[in-house]
Curated annotation (Swiss-Prot):
GO MF term set: glutaminase activity; imidazoleglycerol-phosphate synthase activity; lyase activity
Protein name: Imidazole glycerol phosphate synthase subunit HisH
Record gene name: hisH
NCBIfam families, per the entry: IMP_synth_hisH
Quaternary structure and partners: Heterodimer of HisH and HisF.
Reaction catalyzed: 5-[(5-phospho-1-deoxy-D-ribulos-1-ylimino)methylamino]-1-(5-phospho-beta-D-ribosyl)imidazole-4-carboxamide + L-glutamine = D-erythro-1-(imidazol-4-yl)glycerol 3-phosphate + 5-amino-1-(5-phospho-beta-D-ribosyl)imidazole-4-carboxamide + L-glutamate + H(+); L-glutamine + H2O = L-glutamate + NH4(+)
Keywords: Amino-acid biosynthesis, Cytoplasm, Glutamine amidotransferase, Histidine biosynthesis, Hydrolase, Lyase
Matches recorded under Gene3D superfamilies: 3.40.50.880
Active-site residues, record numbering mapped to chain: 79, 186, 188
Record's keyword annotation contains Lyase: yes
Pathway(s) this gene product operates in, as recorded in its UniProt entry: Amino-acid biosynthesis; L-histidine biosynthesis; L-histidine from 5-phospho-alpha-D-ribose 1-diphosphate: step 5/9
Principal location: cytoplasm
Length: 212
């Protein structure tokens, strides 16, 4: 069973519909005591990094996330939810993140190295390039994914980079280390690529449950 974490800033409808399409049992909750029953978790997110962390702290969901990850349960952050997995963000000053992965969310530049203008936010389809192997991407081909974001992760560990996209800079698109994973793009809006990642995540959670 997948627990979708509701902290007031996630695109819950789209994520829920995507999980239904791949036939995955799930529930949505803002209550730590209910979410503790999940086998794995999805942390969606849209909006401001600082506001998101404030909401997670106020609801004590930040502590739940740390506790569940420490127990070895799988976590998948989506869009802003992926950025929250890292140490901090420079959005509206500096805000601390969950610190589960090393790196910082910084603003996308409005031009590439050649001086060509780029629109920020980065919005639309972009091709993925794969880096390190992971069971999360076992069944996923290097296709296109749908992005909507103004910040990207910089300074992350290379061995945690699973896939990237190019938008004037290398944008970490899929990350993963141990039982913590993230997708900067929206899997629920990314057709075959997105559905494959969600399917693999749920398979990994099911396999982990069997091992226990």
């Amino acid at each position: 069973m997948i627990g979708v974490i509701d902290y007031g800033m996630g695109n819950l409808y789209s994520v829920s519909k995507a999980l239904e399409r791949v036939g995955v049992p799930y529930f949505v909750s803002e209550k730590p005591e209910e979410l503790k029953e999940a086998d794995a978790f999805i942390l969606p997110g849209v909006g401001s990094f600082g506001d998101a962390m404030d909401n997670l702290g106020y609801t004590k969901l930040d502590q739940l996330i740390h506790d569940m990850v420490s127990e070895g349960r799988l976590l998948l952050g989506i869009c802003l939810g992926m950025q929250l997995l890292f140490e901090e963000s420079e959005e509206n000053g500096t805000a601390s993140g969950l610190g589960l992965l090393k790196g910082k969310a910084v603003r996308l530049k409005a031009e590439d190295e050649k001086g060509n203008k780029l629109k920020v936010p980065h919005m639309g389809w972009n091709r993925l390039s794969f880096h390190n192997e992971s069971p999360l991407l076992t069944k996923t081909e290097q296709g296109y994914a749908y992005f909507v974001h103004s910040y990207y992760i910089d300074g992350m560990e290379e061995n945690a980079l699973l896939a990237s996209a190019d938008y004037g800079v290398r944008v970490p698109a899929v990350v993963g280390k141990r039982n913590v994973f993230g997708a900067q793009f929206h899997p629920e809006k990314s057709s075959t690529v997105g559905m494959s990642i969600l399917t693999q995540f749920t398979k990994m959670a099911a396999e982990q449950k069997v091992k226990k």
